[in-house]
Amino acid sequence: MWRRTYLTLVLIRLWFALSPSYLHPDENFQGPEVIAGQIFSYPVRHTWEFTSENPIRSVFPLWPVYGLPMLLLRWLWIGNGQDGEIPPIAVFWTLRVLMFAISFVLEDWALHELIPSPKHRRVAVLLVASSYVTWTYQTHTFSNSVETLVVAWSLVLIQRVADPRQRSCVLSATVLGIVAVFGVFNRITFPAFLVVPGLRLLPVFWKRPTSLVCLTLAAAVTTVIAIGLDTAFYLPDSVTWTDLIHRPVITPLNNFKYNSATENLAQHGLHPWYQHLVGNLPLLLGPAAALLVIRPKLSIRLWSAMSGLVVLSAFQHQEARFLLPTVPLFLSSIRMPRNQTVFYIFTAVWIGFNLALGSLMGIYHQGGVVPGQVFLSQQPDATQAIWWKTYTPPIWLLNGKNEFLTTRDVMGLKGELLLEQLSQLATCDTPADRRNQEYLKEKNGTYLIAPASATWLDPYLSNKGLEGLRFREVWRYRKHLNLDDLDFGDDGVWDTLARVIGRRGLVAWRVTKSCPK
C-alpha cells in the first residue's frame, strides 16, 4: 500500500515540476540565466550579485547542476541535425525535469540511508514526498533546493565515515571534502547545518588520521578549482596563476562580508530574529510543526536542522526558502500520533494543507510570467514590454528576441507614472490596430503585461475614442496569482481576496495612442 502511495506522490511531484509557477526571481537569475548565457547565444541579464565589484555568487556549483545538462542537451540537438539554437523553453522544462529527478533520487535515497528503522523510514519518506515544499521548491532551480540535497548527502557521508563497521573510510572522506566545498560555494549558510553532525568526525580523525588527510586534500583541490572557475568568469582577461595568487575572486568570502553588514541586508528587508521560528518554519511544515514540538525523535538529522535554524536566525534577513534544507530533516524527526483519532485528524489536515499550498505555490504563484515571456518571444512586432506588478521575467526565455525587445520591470511603480511611461513608448494608433492580427505586420509595438487584478487600469481599458491611450488585450493566462498586490489596509481583507483571487490571471495588452496627422 505504501509503495503505491509513494509512487502516486512521485507522479504528483513530477506534475508540479511541469507547472510554470514562478516562486522567486532568484530561481532564474542566480542559476539558469547565468549559465544559459555561457552555453547558448541567448542574450541574458546578470543581476547585481554577478556584476558588483565584489561578486557574491559562484559559478562553480552552477556548472555541474545546470551547465552539464545544457551541454548534453545542446549536443543531442546538434547530433539530431537540428539547425539553430535550442528553444529556451525546451531548456527550461529540461531543467525542471532534472530538478525533479535529482530530488526524487538523491533526496529520497539519502533518507533511506539516514533512517535505520524500516517502519520510521517509510513514514518519513511519505511525509517528505507529500510535502508541498518537495513538490514546488525542490523541483525549481533554487540554490536552496541544491543545498537541501548537499546537506542530506553530507550527513550520509558523515555517517559512513563515522561507521565503525567500515574497514576504510578514505573514499567517503574524500567525497565529503568535495561535497563540503561544493556546498559552501553554493550557499555560505551550508556549514551551519553541519556544526553538530561534524562533531562525530573528531574521534574518527583521531583514530584514522588518513581520513582527515584525504578529506583535507580533496577539499583543498576542489577549493582551488572553484576559485579558478570564479576568477576566470569574473576577470575580463585570461586567467594566469599570478591572478589566482594575487587577485583571486573568492565569492563565499565576498558573500559573507556582504551579509554581515546590516545596511546591506536592509536593502532586502530586515526581520526579527524569531521570524524563522514562528513564521517561516510553520509555513513550510504546516501541522507537522506541532508534532515536531510534541513528539520529536532525537537524531543527527534533528540536530543538523536545529543548528541550521539557530545560525540562520542570527541573520536579520530571513526568507522561508532559506530553511529548505531543514524540511526533510525535521519531517524525518517526528513521531506520528499513537491515538487513532488524532492520527486521522493530523493526516486530513496534512493533506489539506499541502494540497492548498501546493496549488497556490506550484500552479498559481506568478504562474503567467514564464508563459508570458514565451508569448512575447513569438510577437514579431514587440519592441517594448512593460511588466507591472509581476516578478522580473527571465530574459533568456525570449530566445534572442531581446536584441530587439526592451524589457522594463516596473513592479512597484505608481499608476500615474506607469501611464507616463506608456504615453512615451506607445506607438501611434492605426486602422491596422483595430483589425484582427493585422498589427503583427507593424515594425514596432508596445506591450503592457500586468495582473488582471490590477483594477487601477480599469478606467483606461475601455477607451475606444480618439484621445489618450488604447489598450487591446492580445493574450491572457488564467493560472496566475499576484500575492504582492494584497492591499488589506485600503480595500479590506475580503474585498482584497475577492479581487486577487476572483480576477486571477495575467494579461498582455498592446498599447497604442492617438497621434496628430
From Swiss-Prot:
Its EC number is 2.4.1.-. Glycans are attached at residues 339, 444. GO terms for molecular function: alpha-1,2-mannosyltransferase activity. Its main location: endoplasmic reticulum. It is found in: Endoplasmic reticulum membrane. It is an enzyme of class 2 (transferase). Alpha-1,2-mannosyltransferase involved in glycosylphosphatidylinositol-anchor biosynthesis. Transfers a fourth mannose to trimannosyl-GPIs during GPI precursor assembly. The presence of a fourth mannose in GPI is essential in fungi. Belongs to the glycosyltransferase 22 family. PIGZ subfamily. This is GPI mannosyltransferase 4. It comes from Gibberella zeae (strain ATCC MYA-4620 / CBS 123657 / FGSC 9075 / NRRL 31084 / PH-1). The lineage of its organism: Eukaryota, Fungi, Dikarya, Ascomycota, Pezizomycotina.
